[in-house]
């Protein structure tokens, strides 16, 4: 039987509050993270992802207190990212109640950190977040046409996004959180080309992120190769039964959901 597609609300947190902007700019307050996490748990979410959107840029530590309070309220897997630099942060997150840690900027700066974390805790604990954007005129071209960015999409690296996902998979990362910076917050749908390219390169689960606006946007991402689908504003600002609507759309397209 096919593995069920996971539906994952994402909580972007800044100073203890959930926010959501378009293309990571102009953040808007979407509420209390613990309250929202509780709502999503009750609403049928399969997992939650919690990203401290200021941690890497402002070099601040992840808000461990919010993680602890969230973990006390929800009983579905919780992935936490933002400011994760190595074994010490992952250890602390797990102790505060996270199930998985997501790493981005620190892994780009020092890929060996992937090996260190997976050796210490196992692959299942580590998610590599890849903030990919299409290369633009004047950028260093990449063979896939997508480059890795860091610091919430603000800094281009010139690293090929598909090659980076493959390297991380080879190093033992458990899954890839594949976020399209171009599609993020637009509500125009996922970047299907990006998903297809990474799916062809790796054998580990892919969580598609960036661009969801309506339930109909989710099945094409699964068809393109995503094992899980992640979104923020469509859940934060949509009707209370949005997770159920998304699962119905995926099920109606012929895919298994939980």
Swiss-Prot record:
Compartment list: Cytoplasm
GO CC, alphabetical: cytoplasm
UniProt-annotated catalytic positions: 12, 131
An MF annotation (GO) of this entry: imidazoleglycerol-phosphate synthase activity
Domain of life: Bacteria
Gene Ontology biological process: L-histidine biosynthetic process
CDD domains documented for this protein: HisF
Residue ranges of the TM segments: none
Cited Gene3D superfamilies: Aldolase class I
Pfam families: His_biosynth (PF00977)
Family as reported in the entry's similarity comment: Belongs to the HisA/HisF family.
Subunit structure: Heterodimer of HisH and HisF.
Protein function: IGPS catalyzes the conversion of PRFAR and glutamine to IGP, AICAR and glutamate. The HisF subunit catalyzes the cyclization activity that produces IGP and AICAR from PRFAR using the ammonia provided by the HisH subunit.
Protein name from the UniProt record: Imidazole glycerol phosphate synthase subunit HisF
Organism for this UniProt entry: Paenarthrobacter aurescens (strain TC1)
Lineage: Bacteria, Bacillati, Actinomycetota, Actinomycetes, Micrococcales
């Amino acid at each position: 039987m096919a593995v069920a597609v996971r539906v994952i609300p994402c909580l972007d947190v800044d100073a203890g509050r959930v926010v959501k902007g378009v293309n990571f700019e102009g953040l808007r307050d979407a509420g209390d993270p613990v309250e929202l996490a509780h709502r999503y748990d009750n609403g049928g979410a399969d997992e939650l992802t919690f990203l401290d959107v200021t941690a890497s840029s402002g070099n601040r530590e992840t808000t461990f207190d919010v993680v602890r309070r969230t973990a006390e309220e929800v009983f579905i897997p919780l992935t936490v990212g933002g400011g994760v630099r190595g074994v010490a942060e992952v250890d602390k997150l797990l102790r505060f109640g996270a199930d998985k840690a997501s790493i981005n900027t620190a892994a780009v700066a020092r890929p060996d950190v992937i090996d260190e974390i997976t050796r210490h805790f196992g692959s299942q604990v580590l998610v590599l977040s890849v903030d990919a954007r299409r290369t633009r005129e004047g950028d260093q071209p990449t063979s896939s046409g997508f480059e890795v960015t860091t610091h919430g999409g603000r800094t281009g690296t010139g690293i090929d996004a598909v090659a980076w996902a493959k390297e991380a998979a080879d190093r033992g990362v458990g899954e890839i959180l594949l976020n399209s910076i171009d599609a993020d917050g637009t509500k125009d749908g996922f970047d299907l080309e990006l998903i297809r390219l990474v799916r062809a390169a790796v054998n580990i689960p892919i969580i598609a992120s960036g661009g969801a606006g309506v339930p109909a946007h989710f099945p094409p991402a699964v068809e393109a190769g995503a094992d899980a689908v992640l979104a923020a504003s469509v859940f934060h600002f949509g009707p209370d039964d949005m997770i159920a609507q998304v699962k119905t759309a995926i099920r109606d397209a012929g895919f298994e959901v939980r």
